[in-house]
């Protein structure tokens, strides 16, 4: 699989190597593999090394001519470094330690490089937005320059995880820590491409007589009111989807679906009550009995069960969201989504006649043929239009909403969630047009029937409301 991927990659970039006059000066075969090795002590170190050596050999055999390098925390070189590839230390601010560890794993010599120098940090939903003072970033930059250490800012511009592209981490307190839609990162250049005080501090440090002027901001607009004129219950869309029938709930992968949502449905011919256990939830679910909301279950908060009462001839519905795939550490290979283990009620495994409805939301839902049917505490799609005389970047204000995604002119601009700290969604002006524009919002919780939406001129990325997600 890696060889097939690398072959396609090589064919696209082979002429872009510096040896052929292009911009590619080095190639990294793995990213922070040492972190994975450290967490997978059940696998012998020599087996890990065989894997990473094979990866670099494939790259070499294809014809890459530029130097290879690895990228790990300085304390993880034992698992990540590889002979023939320059070891670089992510996030290492101690010059002496950097040189010591690189010398140890690179035949007593440099060059010395920090492949990931963090001027900020990524953020997860329901957690504080990390920041770093401009003077701290500038001071560390000067320290590297004074000691002839090469470095790469990660990130200089973070940007946005549009659509379903955001990843995730995990820790002891949370089985998943989904990344926010915004990847602003408190980087020198903001999510919307603005120069920040941090950028100006670095520019002052690095500028020469030939440094060009800072570009002007892209035009910014505010949309004071977007009327939402149609509300459609997600069940109405589900009714037009052919279900997959199985004895047990199927994962996203078994359903050949990568992103979005799956609606799991089970009809009961006999009543049952007790504790509903969904230990295999990946990642977020709202549970309904006969259309009435019973509970929210959530992998971030490790909430996997609730009390439930299913009467005679009732229907249990569980709408599950994939909140993003873990992309760091040993759990990168445990990334199935949906319901991945049995559903249990009152100690009884629930099998037989499960229905799965695939809702990947890979395209903006077409609500033209549907009548208004949205209700409070039901998964609901909202549609509206707005007219612009001019276009520009803007930020949709989602502070009054619960959890969901937004499409504008057919483009999924990302997830929102009331827990924060992100409360706005960046909407680039290039996706807007003069005249009529269309918006569709899928609101999963729908605790209030919404009538309108607005956009504002500045982002809100530090408004944390974690209690709203519990």
Please provide the spans of the model-predicted regions:
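The substrate-binding groove and active-site-proximal loops of carbohydrate-active enzymes
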Residues: 1-4, 30-49, 86-93, 118-136, ...
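Edge strands and adjacent loops of beta-rich recognition modules
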Residues: 232-265, 358-382
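A cross-kingdom feature marking solvent-exposed beta-strand/loop segments within repeated
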Residues: 175-176, 180-184, 198, 250-254, ...
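Aromatic-lined ligand-binding clefts that engage carbohydrates, nucleic acids, or primary amines
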Residues: 274-288, 316, 386-409, 416-417, ...
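Catalytic-core region of carbohydrate-active enzymes that cleave or remodel glycosidic bonds
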Residues: 61, 92-190, 194, 205
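Glycine/proline-rich low-complexity spacer/linker segments in large multi-domain proteins
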Residues: 321-352, 446-470
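Aromatic- and carboxylate-lined catalytic core of secreted/periplasmic carbohydrate-active enzymes
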Residues: 179-233
